[in-house]
Structure formats: structure tokens, C-alpha cells
Amino acid sequence: MEEYHRPCDEVGFNADEAHNIVKECIDGVLGGEDYNQNNINQWTASIVEQSLAHLVKLGKAYKYIVTCAVVQRSPYGFHTASSCFWDTTSDGTCTVRWENRTMNCIVNVFAIAIVL
């Protein structure tokens, strides 16, 4: 029986690649929509599930954590923060901020390298 080795040619997490993937997922779900509280659960679930599926399809040796927050746009602003204790040479994070005239969306991707 042959062993399967996941391709991992590059060292470190490619945040630009992840950013582009997540941005496309957000655009696909929220593009053209106005804020509607009744749709938030569906929208956030779709964004994290699609983002995760596309990241996994890259076939890289990472475990991913994807979070998403969608809030109604207001003059009061919206602030988030996160902190991680990990190997900065192989693990990484990417934050995507998206907005339209009625809402703001923040997606965080945390990638933790799998050491085989």
C-alpha cells in the first residue's frame, strides 16, 4: 500500500493566497446584499464553510480555523483582536475586511502547520 504525502513545497503560510480565497467567498455570499439580521447565521456559516473548503482543496499540510463576524454598519465602528502562540516560521494568520454601505464583515483564518 502506498503512503499518501500531502504536497508542502513552500515553507510558511501564504497569507495572500488565503486572502484572495476568502475575499472571493465573501463576495459570493454578501455581494449585492443589504444587511438583514435574519440572514446573518446563514451568511456567516456559508462564508466559513466555503472558505474552509477552498483552503483545504489547496492540499497543504495545515489545520485551519476560520471565524467570521458580520455586523450592521454604524458610526460607532467595529473592533476585533486575536492573539496566538505558535511557530511563526510555519503557522500564520490572515484577516480579510469587507464592507458595503450597510454592513461590515471580518474573516480571520488561522493556519497551523501539520508536522508529519
From Swiss-Prot:
CDD domains: DLC-like_DYNLT3. InterPro entries: Tctex-1-like, Tctex-1-like_sf. The modification 3'-nitrotyrosine is found at Y4. GO terms for cellular component: cytoplasm; cytoplasmic dynein complex; kinetochore; microtubule; nucleus. Disulfide bonds: none annotated. It holds the Pfam family Tctex-1. Its main location: nucleus. Keywords: Cell cycle, Cell division, Centromere, Chromosome, Cytoplasm, Cytoskeleton, Dynein, Kinetochore, Microtubule, Mitosis, Motor protein, Nitration, Nucleus, Transport. One of its GO terms (biological process) is cell division. It is found in: Nucleus; Cytoplasm, Cytoskeleton; Chromosome, Centromere, Kinetochore. One of its GO terms (molecular function) is identical protein binding. Homodimer. The cytoplasmic dynein 1 complex consists of two catalytic heavy chains (HCs) and a number of non-catalytic subunits presented by intermediate chains (ICs), light intermediate chains (LICs) and light chains (LCs); the composition seems to vary in respect to the IC, LIC and LC composition. The heavy chain homodimer serves as a scaffold for the probable homodimeric assembly of the respective non-catalytic subunits. The ICs and LICs bind directly to the HC dimer and the LCs assemble on the IC dimer. DYNLT1 and DYNLT3 compete for association with dynein IC (DYNC1I1 or DYNC1I2). Acts as one of several non-catalytic accessory components of the cytoplasmic dynein 1 complex that are thought to be involved in linking dynein to cargos and to adapter proteins that regulate dynein function. Cytoplasmic dynein 1 acts as a motor for the intracellular retrograde motility of vesicles and organelles along microtubules. Probably binds BUB3 as part of transport cargo. Required for the efficient progression through mitosis. Belongs to the dynein light chain Tctex-type family. This is Dynein light chain Tctex-type 3.
